[in-house]
From Swiss-Prot:
Residues 423-440 have a biased composition (Basic and acidic residues). One of its GO terms (cellular component) is ribonucleoprotein complex. Packages the positive strand viral genome RNA into a helical ribonucleocapsid (RNP) and plays a fundamental role during virion assembly through its interactions with the viral genome and membrane protein M. Plays an important role in enhancing the efficiency of subgenomic viral RNA transcription as well as viral replication. ADP-ribosylated. The ADP-ribosylation is retained in the virion during infection. Phosphorylated on serine and threonine residues. Pfam families: CoV_nucleocap. Residues 61-190 form the CoV N NTD domain. This is Nucleoprotein.
Length: 449
């Protein structure tokens, strides 16, 4: 006996018209229901999966009994756990709950900017022995097919399920037993992701102006129930900041006090948990650069992990598993250098490690990594070799005028002239004669030439 999803099996016969798939239909009911559904429009059945005939002619449609599952996030795998993934269908026992999900690659469309955009695929369920892969055994490795079955089903025999006739049977909304985990990045068609008012608003102009139709047509224009608004998060944040006495419109500035707090918070952490940044530099976290700490130079010492070049170096850092299982470890007890005799003495240990990070030229960003490594490895040596010992500028003592120098060892340049030397000399007879003429009264010369 074949089973029909959505129909309870019954052994009772009837004198009505029985279709080929075993579903009882009365002729007047069938015609009436078709007229009600179409309302004068041509019936266009939805094709869920297609395959080409050997002759290469027409397209043979396969109709799933259930609504599809659509992907909405790229890169997500379609999969169910073992024993899960078969939709619930009244009238189908658990022994027949076996089949496969078929990936239907949808068409692409042209966007406003002229580019082609491919729609993400949609998956449909077919019982074992039906659909586009009816001839394949359960578990056959086929691209775009994911096999599922309940724990009570016999996967060695096809499911005794009739094919769906779209003219008489509508697709059943996909539902799963409790505990089923839906694949991440997928949603069930008709589960509420589409706009709920689109159907009522699109059908409203074609309905007769009855009371019921008016209420349905206006349902799309109703104001939504007060709920979450787009700016509700901003309002809540503003209320919280106002409660704390802060202004949300003013940008938060990093003051010396906040920088000191951040630095102290970092330094309170164990040495191996510190992350240097602008507020707490590399030397403040780990000390000066030297033979045992030979990485870092220039801006990277000031910025630490905030340096724009640091993230690409972080790709080389080992994981916790690689650190413990891929290194040579040695536990050593060291001297406690706390220096406070009042505090109880603690046993201090060091977990010393020795390992290597191996990479080659095929690594993404290899050239940049090599450049950054060459700039920062043993950079402290280049800084000491190229550093110039410039004496500090002498500071002027309070009350001392500019130009006064108290150091007698500083030599002063020789004056360039006698006037600059400011030395006294004896007057000659010619000088005395000139001085007398300057003292005589001035008389105007009236002689004619």
């Amino acid at each position: 006996m074949s089973f029909t999803p959505g129909k309870q099996s019954s052994s009772r016969a009837s004198s009505g018209n029985r279709s080929g798939n075993g579903i009882l239909k009365w002729a007047d009911q069938s015609d009436q229901s078709r007229n009600v559904q179409t309302r004068g429009r041509r019936v266009q059945s939805k094709q869920t999966a297609t395959s080409q005939q050997p002759s290469g002619g027409t397209v043979v449609p396969y109709y799933s009994w259930f609504s599809g599952i659509t992907q909405f996030q790229k890169g997500k795998e379609f999969e169910f756990a073992e024993g899960q993934g078969v939709p619930i269908a009244p009238g189908v026992p658990a022994t027949e709950a076996k089949g496969y999900w078929y990936r239907h690659n949808r068409r692409s469309f042209k966007t406003a900017d002229g580019n082609q955009r491919q729609l993400l695929p949609r998956w449909y369920f077919y019982y074992l022995g039906t659909g586009p892969h009816a001839k394949h055994q359960y578990g056959t490795d086929i691209d775009g097919v994911f096999w599922v079955a309940s724990n009570q089903a016999d996967i060695n025999t096809p499911a005794d399920i009739v094919d769906r006739d779209p003219s008489s049977d509508e697709a059943i909304p996909t539902r799963f037993p409790p505990g089923t985990v839906l694949p991440q990045g997928y949603y069930i068609e008709g589960s509420g992701r589409s706009a709920p008012n689109s159907r009522s608003t699109s059908r409203a102009p074609n309905r007769a102006p009855s009371a019921g139709s008016r209420s349905r047509a206006n349902s799309g224009n109703r104001t939504s129930t007060p709920g979450v608004t787009p700016d509700m998060a901003d309002q809540i944040a503003s209320l919280v900041l106002a409660k704390l006495g802060k202004d949300a419109t003013k940008p938060q500035q990093v003051t010396k006090q906040t920088a000191k707090e951040v630095r102290q918070k970092i330094l309170n952490k164990p040495r191996q948990k510190r992350s240097p940044n602008k507020q707490c530099t590399v030397q403040q976290c780990f000390g000066k650069r030297g033979p045992n700490q030979n990485f870092g130079g220039g801006e990277m010492l000031k910025l630490g992990t905030s340096d724009p070049q640091f993230p690409i170096l972080a790709e080389l850092a080992p994981t916790a598993g690689a650190f413990f299982f891929g290194s040579r470890l040695e536990l050593a007890k060291v001297q406690n250098l706390s220096g406070n005799p009042d505090e109880p003495q603690k046993d201090v240990y060091e977990l010393r490690y020795n390992g290597a990070i191996r990479f080659d030229s095929t690594l993404s960003g290899f050239e940049t990594i090599m450049k950054v490594l060459n700039q920062n490895l043993n950079a402290y040596q280049h800084q000491e070799d190229g550093m110039m010992n410039i004496s500090p500028k002498p500071q002027r003592q309070r009350g001392q005028k500019n130009g006064q120098v108290e150091n007698d060892n500083i030599s002063v340049a020789a004056p360039k002239s006698r006037v600059q030397q400011n030395k006294s000399r004896e007057l000659t007879a010619e000088d005395i004669s000139l001085l007398k003429k300057m003292d005589e009264p001035y008389t105007e010369d009236t002689s004619e030439i």
